[in-house]
Amino acid sequence: MNLNSNIAEFCTTNFKYMIALSVNINKIATIRNARGGNTPDVIVAAQNIERFGADGITVHPRPDERHIRYADVPALKKVVKTEFNVEGYPTSDFMELVIQSKPNQVTLVPDAPDAITSNAGWDVETHFDFLSGIVKELKSHGMRVSIFMEANPALMAKAAATGTDRVELYTESYAVGYSFDKEKAVAPFIETAKAAHSAGLGVNAGHDLNMANLKYFAQQVPHLDEVSIGHALISDALYFGLENTVQMYKNELM
């Protein structure tokens, strides 16, 4: 075994793969919009969250702009120094927004316009042609693309065939099942992550991940690149402070 092989083996054995924490700031925008004006300022909040150790900022602008407004996206793009991830259903307005703003990553979500929160993943078999066209368009503008998917290893090869770079695994079923049988709850995500990796896809995850269930998920699911967390993290920040909370969530990923 040569020196390079020894170094590679040492690194593999002794250093854990780092999972990125992207903080969804929609809830901060919800508070702002409840009173009008610009308090709290989502731009300042995003800058502070990065300074406190987050690896990225996520937003999900919806057509009714009930939290993040379309105008927030280019403003955030100017100041976010880590990774900027914009989620949403690819309407013509959404596509125009992200093509002009050019975030690092666009996550395609099959939301109805009136959805309170994301509640399902894409059926890539039914929407294959549609997704393939959208992915091609976004990638032609230099953006990484992720598709929001439920945990189903059988669909990962089909997802990869759209040309997407990553999938984001919809983790609500894990969060619901964690308290009853965490091994059973995480099992589909382990197999789906393996299948995604085998298909050449990066793996993100999000929805209802929190301080109670995050560490186990991160320990069990292989090839995990990024988690996106908003509601739980911002809620915890009311008790622990934003800086402490970001660092607490980061520690759960170590």
Spans of model-derived segments:
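Glycine-rich phosphate-binding active-site loops on the catalytic face of alpha/beta enzymes
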Residues: L108-A115, R166-Y178, H223-L242
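Glycine-enriched alpha-helix->loop->beta-strand junction motifs that scaffold or abut catalytic
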Residues: G53-D55, V79-K81, Q100-V106, S140, ...
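Conserved N-terminal beta1-alpha1 strand-loop-helix module at the mouth
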Residues: T12-D93, L97-P103, K184
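C-terminal helical cap(s) of enzyme catalytic domains, especially alpha/beta-barrels
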Residues: K77, A120, D181-K182, D236-M254
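Hydrophobic faces of well-ordered beta-strands that scaffold small-molecule active sites
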Residues: I19-I25, I57-V59, F84-V86, V106-L108, ...
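Alpha-helix-loop-beta-strand connector modules within alpha/beta enzyme cores
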Residues: R66-S92, T126-S146, K182-A205, Y249-L253
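Catalytic cores of alpha/beta
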Residues: S92-S101, N152-T162, L209-L224
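Histidine/lysine/aspartate-rich catalytic loop segments that bind and position anionic ligands
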Residues: R144-A196
